[in-house]
Amino acid sequence: MDKLSIREDNYNIKHKTISLNRASSVTRNLKGLLKFLGPAFVVSVAYIDPGNFATNISGGSSFNYNLIWVILWSNLMAIFLQTMSAKLGIATGCSLPEMCAKVFSKRANWIFWIVGELGAMATDLAEFIGGTLGLYLLFRIPMIYAGLLTGVLTFIIVYMEKYGQKMVETIIAALIAVICVAYTIELFLARPAWTQVGMHTLIPSLPNGEAVLIAVGMLGATVMPHVIYLHSELVQHRNTNSSDKEKLHHLKMEKIDILIAMNIAFVVNAAMVIVSAAVFFKHGIKVSTIEEAHRSLQPLLGNLSSGAFGIALLASGLSSSAVGTMAGQTIMKGFVNLSIPINLRRIITMLPALIIIALGINPMRVLVLSQVALSFILPFPIIQMLLIAGRKDLMGILVNKKFTKIVGFIIATMIILLNIILLYLTFTGQT
């Protein structure tokens, strides 16, 4: 009997030890993962910016749940390109602009810098106006004062980088969380038809010609050029740049970071379409402006819904505007090895937006024109990245494999063609 008791005790001790070891291993793995989380959350902000609000709301209010699949495909392409950008940064120990400076001629890099800066400024213009609109809709602050306050708030976010990149990543992740909570509230209040949501997420459909136009707008303007540049820079803060084994581990962790962050962005974008379909389409309201969407939510779903919408728009505008400023710094430093104080850059980039606000120009029109500008610029970082990431002498063990090159070429061609179509439709007045 004593021997049996001893055996049972030994068995229990052994299994408790195994359980403790497993728990300890899970804790270690989680801590290791948390150390690498952050860069993808920063760049994911570009995929839930005020421009996305406009296109997603338009798509849902016009075509019910039919265009949710566009969000899914856009997200898959974005994951692929952001992974390649991060891989380039990890493999080379340099950002994409820095690698361009090494690979291409000085004249070419000056052109790349000008084009990249224009892209960052066009993006920042849209984000800044989105943040301003958020403040205006929430607090009815006059647009010009809301613009000045947006400038101050985004400067504070960017200034926090002084205390380390992790600080900025945490602030932006918190703002993303605010957007997620706001749209969770919206979904709860909207009560969508989930069966239709699931069907239209997986089954592509384009009811008519106008749906094609909106789908092109949603898909063609999804990938933002400035965050392709920025992602390759953000991974440097965790890049030991030593052995191939460490690079492979870093890439593995960053892929997890990208999958988590980009799928959160997918859920938020899908929620925008779903809420718009469940509320506006259901009641026969075709929404064409952000202000109209905010105004229409209140009588249909109440103050909580319109308030959540305003908060989400404000958080989106502030976070994405801050990211645009960071990207501008990366672009200038990388291509031409120049830099200006972050506060001066913030002032320079906010001036065009303040002028537009002061002149009373329609913010929705500005959002459209900024997307057009980005459409011109987008091919540059994609082609640069594909050329560099395909070179074994630069990428080493992380060089793009043949299959990755083919997929990259197909995605790049598709995005560029869609943007050309979007430009044509915009200039011919069909958007």
From Swiss-Prot:
PANTHER family xrefs: NATURAL RESISTANCE-ASSOCIATED MACROPHAGE PROTEIN 2, SOLUTE CARRIER PROTEIN FAMILY 11 MEMBER
Organism annotation: Clostridium acetobutylicum (strain ATCC 824 / DSM 792 / JCM 1419 / IAM 19013 / LMG 5710 / NBRC 13948 / NRRL B-527 / VKM B-1787 / 2291 / W)
Domain of life: Bacteria
GO BP annotation list: iron ion transmembrane transport
UniProt-recorded name of the protein: Divalent metal cation transporter MntH
Role of this protein: H(+)-stimulated, divalent metal cation uptake system.
Family listed: Belongs to the NRAMP family.
Classification of source organism: Bacteria, Bacillati, Bacillota, Clostridia, Eubacteriales
UniProt entry tagged with the keyword Membrane: yes
